[in-house]
């Protein structure tokens, strides 16, 4: 389909390796705990800590926690994959062929971006549920919408942070 030197071929190959080596979707329980339960509890604990410390707007804490988890999730995934590739000797081969291979870095980022996006949507859902149960949903709706619109920017920030940290 693609030539081996083609940008899309390299991007697709790298993304496929990331997908096949990810254990997140190994079982339903693994996917639920990795993408929903643990991140949701993290946001909930941040909100409860903010309420305990008498923070004026716990929904803002939930949105900030959700967006920060997206950036850090993507960055951690990119760094972990680059470290694995460095250990296997793949990273040296890629850097020898091209000084900066955008296809490699985008392929490496594909799986962390997907996982962080799912986690971010879940976390913002937890923030919306908290706002709804707290009775301040109308006042927090604009903040939730702004947080959703910031998701692509946080994904790009996570990619950049991961590439520069790797």
Question: Whereabouts are the PLM-identified features?
Answer:
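Hydrophobic transmembrane alpha-helices and immediately adjacent juxtamembrane helices
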Residues: 1-166
């Amino acid at each position: 389909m693609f030539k081996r030197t083609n940008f899309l071929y390299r991007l697709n190959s790298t993304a496929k390796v990331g997908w096949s080596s990810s254990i997140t979707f190994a079982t339903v329980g693994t996917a639920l705990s990795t993408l929903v339960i643990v991140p949701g509890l993290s946001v909930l604990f941040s909100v409860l800590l903010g309420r305990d410390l008498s923070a004026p707007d716990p929904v803002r804490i939930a949105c900030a926690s959700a967006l920060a988890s997206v950036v850090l999730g993507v960055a951690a995934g990119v760094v972990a994959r680059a470290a694995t590739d460095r250990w296997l000797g793949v990273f040296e081969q890629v850097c020898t062929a091209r000084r900066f291979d955008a296809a490699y870095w985008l392929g490496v980022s594909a799986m962390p971006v997907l996982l962080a996006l799912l986690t971010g949507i879940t976390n913002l859902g937890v923030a919306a549920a908290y706002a709804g149960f707290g009775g301040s949903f109308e006042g927090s709706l604009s903040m939730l919408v702004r947080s959703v619109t910031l998701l692509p920017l946080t994904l790009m920030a996570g990619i950049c942070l991961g590439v520069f940290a790797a």
